[in-house]
Amino acid sequence: MAKDKKFVEDITPMDEDFAQWYTDIVKKAELADYSSIKGCMIIRPNGYAIWENIQKYVDTKLKEYGHENVSMPIFIPENLLQKEKDHVEGFAPEVAWVTHGGDDELAERLCVRPTSETLFCEHYAKIVQSYKDLPKLYNQWCSVVRWEKTTRPFLRTTEFLWQEGHTIHETKEEAESHSLKILNMYSRLCEDMLAMPVVMGKKTEKEKFAGADDTYTIESLMHDGKALQAGTSHYLGQNFSKAFAIQFSDRNGKLEYPHYTTWAVTTRLIGAIIMVHGDDSGLKLPPRIAPTQAVIIPVAQHKEGVLEKAKELKERLAKVVRVKLDDSDKMPGWKYSEYEMKGIPLRIEIGPKDIEKNQAVLVRRDNREKTIVSLDEIEVKVQEMLDIIHNSMLEEARKSRDEKTYVAITMEEFEDIIENKPGFIKAMWCGDRACEDKIREVTGATSRCMPFEQEVVSDTCVCCGKKAKNLVYWGRAY
């Protein structure tokens, strides 16, 4: 029992060592474990179930929009990868290569996919002839490999899970509209399911996806004041279509190149959930994404009728929420700590006195508030409570982000904020790449996005003092 107690309690305080706190939660909440391969992880059932719920939401939305799922090969021939110059240069440092099949050296190296634009383009070139074939709306769920130098579970790993959408369209307007439609869906995923507020915007030329005309992004802020790119949607223009000779006959019989979009979210969203919502007691899962939304803990379960009532309660609640009954022989106090550490949104306690009064006690994970409810209306009350918890977690995360969002007019202010008050910095920018590079060199901060909701906090660039063009969110990032 002492060992079990230590397992539950031994989490490094986040203010003492945020990185170790994060690692402790990943391991102790049984989300993932380290693999023997550097930079790779084993996603355990608790972690994978969160990803499955993300998948379910995204897949349902994509199918509502008319997308179809496909599966592309994991290998890309070297000649295919090199067809789009900017694209291959952007990924070259991260590519893993297969050079042998068994004992035989391959005639051509095969890249282990870092992303699949080249494969989709090769396929689209074969199947598209007319405007009547458009749009093509494909998506795949898979893993990709990027040989990262610095890794951390979920946030940056050599291999990770994602969905990648690849669509081609008749017109630029249709493709751009589709890119933004997907970005809006990602934003709703984060806010409506993960209780995580995001800033929507456009990446600068320096930060956009290799080979894209425009990259749109949703940016989130972690508890330690670092930014995290939660999802991206790219308008690739006709760059890839031309490189791969994808052409169609338009409505006038003229050959044209389709307009391409690609977009993705990954398992790094699980890392974001940990770092936005977690506390020193462990994980704190938003109810709508939590694999288990409520756990029933019988108190004095050895007493007559308690376990039977708890089982009856589980049967009732299982019709409306994802619920678990813990009837193990561990002490209730140990169970409270364990499920708090694992982030279960709602704990339901029921003991002999509760049964006498026809009631149960609901305990929220987010603020530990207790509420007594009648067993006659517990299905409704539990669902209402889960919605309250979601809204409260979203509001708390938004408040934390807003409190850590600052305005800088000069470089002196910028440097002072970045060193002493980690968070987002809103500052004006002239649009010159040299200023963007200098800000990163001096402060370690990168441009996160030019938000769609622009405002003017100054007339001049924070770096050079020249006339400003855009408001930019800046920050140090994962």
From Swiss-Prot:
<dbReference type="GO" id="GO:0006433">
    <property type="term" value="P:prolyl-tRNA aminoacylation"/>
</dbReference>
<protein>
    <recommendedName>
        <fullName>Proline--tRNA ligase</fullName>
        <ecNumber>6.1.1.15</ecNumber>
    </recommendedName>
</protein>
<dbReference type="InterPro" id="IPR006195">
    <property type="entry name" value="aa-tRNA-synth_II"/>
</dbReference>
<dbReference type="GO" id="GO:0005524">
    <property type="term" value="F:ATP binding"/>
</dbReference>
<dbReference type="GO" id="GO:0005737">
    <property type="term" value="C:cytoplasm"/>
</dbReference>
<keyword id="KW-0436">Ligase</keyword>
<dbReference type="InterPro" id="IPR004154">
    <property type="entry name" value="Anticodon-bd"/>
</dbReference>
<dbReference type="InterPro" id="IPR033721">
    <property type="entry name" value="ProRS_core_arch_euk"/>
</dbReference>
<dbReference type="Pfam" id="PF00587">
    <property type="entry name" value="tRNA-synt_2b"/>
</dbReference>
<keyword id="KW-0030">Aminoacyl-tRNA synthetase</keyword>
<dbReference type="InterPro" id="IPR016061">
    <property type="entry name" value="Pro-tRNA_ligase_II_C"/>
</dbReference>
<keyword id="KW-0963">Cytoplasm</keyword>
<comment type="similarity">
    <text>Belongs to the class-II aminoacyl-tRNA synthetase family. ProS type 3 subfamily.</text>
</comment>
<dbReference type="GO" id="GO:0017101">
    <property type="term" value="C:aminoacyl-tRNA synthetase multienzyme complex"/>
</dbReference>
<dbReference type="InterPro" id="IPR004499">
    <property type="entry name" value="Pro-tRNA-ligase_IIa_arc-type"/>
</dbReference>
<dbReference type="InterPro" id="IPR017449">
    <property type="entry name" value="Pro-tRNA_synth_II"/>
</dbReference>
<dbReference type="Pfam" id="PF09180">
    <property type="entry name" value="ProRS-C_1"/>
</dbReference>
<comment type="subunit">
    <text>Homodimer.</text>
</comment>
<keyword id="KW-0067">ATP-binding</keyword>
<keyword id="KW-0648">Protein biosynthesis</keyword>
<dbReference type="InterPro" id="IPR002316">
    <property type="entry name" value="Pro-tRNA-ligase_IIa"/>
</dbReference>
<dbReference type="InterPro" id="IPR036621">
    <property type="entry name" value="Anticodon-bd_dom_sf"/>
</dbReference>
<dbReference type="InterPro" id="IPR002314">
    <property type="entry name" value="aa-tRNA-synt_IIb"/>
</dbReference>
<dbReference type="GO" id="GO:0140096">
    <property type="term" value="F:catalytic activity, acting on a protein"/>
</dbReference>
<dbReference type="GO" id="GO:0016740">
    <property type="term" value="F:transferase activity"/>
</dbReference>
<dbReference type="InterPro" id="IPR045864">
    <property type="entry name" value="aa-tRNA-synth_II/BPL/LPL"/>
</dbReference>
<dbReference type="Pfam" id="PF03129">
    <property type="entry name" value="HGTP_anticodon"/>
</dbReference>
<comment type="function">
    <text>Catalyzes the attachment of proline to tRNA(Pro) in a two-step reaction: proline is first activated by ATP to form Pro-AMP and then transferred to the acceptor end of tRNA(Pro).</text>
</comment>
<keyword id="KW-0547">Nucleotide-binding</keyword>
<dbReference type="GO" id="GO:0004827">
    <property type="term" value="F:proline-tRNA ligase activity"/>
</dbReference>
